[in-house]
């Protein structure tokens, strides 16, 4: 019986360990596009900290600092884009949520940015 328990423990999936940050991988927000659109927010963060942030409507550069499980986003001003009021509000909310992110974790292909509003992103498969 003890041998079976040891074998089971050895073959069971390990608890999710913090892996390496997925630099240079496109990450798509784990939400459906808004009605009438195919777009969802996308993050692409380089190992040098330079990032491209595509929100619901606007896009622009950012600087991202990653140290262990800590992360900090500094978004540059983004040019206005013609959008519906709903998308403009969603952009403002997403930018505010990214500015408040303090940590991250990865489980499989899901990267969770942790702050007052957790944000789940899926690694792109293309």
Give residue spans per PLM region:
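Bacterial N-terminal signal peptides
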Residues: 2-10
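Lipid interaction determinants
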Residues: 9-126
């Amino acid at each position: 019986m003890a041998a079976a328990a040891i074998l089971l423990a050895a073959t069971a999936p390990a608890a999710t360990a913090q892996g390496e940050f997925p630099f240079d991988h496109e990450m798509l927000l784990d939400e459906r596009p808004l009605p009438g659109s195919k777009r969802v927010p996308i993050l692409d963060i380089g190992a040098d900290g330079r990032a491209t942030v595509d929100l619901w409507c606007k896009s622009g550069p950012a600087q991202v600092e990653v140290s262990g499980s800590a992360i900090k986003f500094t978004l540059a001003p983004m040019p206005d884009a013609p959008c519906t009021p709903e998308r403009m509000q969603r952009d403002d909310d997403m930018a505010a949520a990214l500015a408040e992110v303090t940590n991250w974790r990865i489980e499989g292909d899901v990267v969770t940015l942790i702050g007052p509003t957790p944000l789940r992103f899926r690694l792109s498969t293309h």
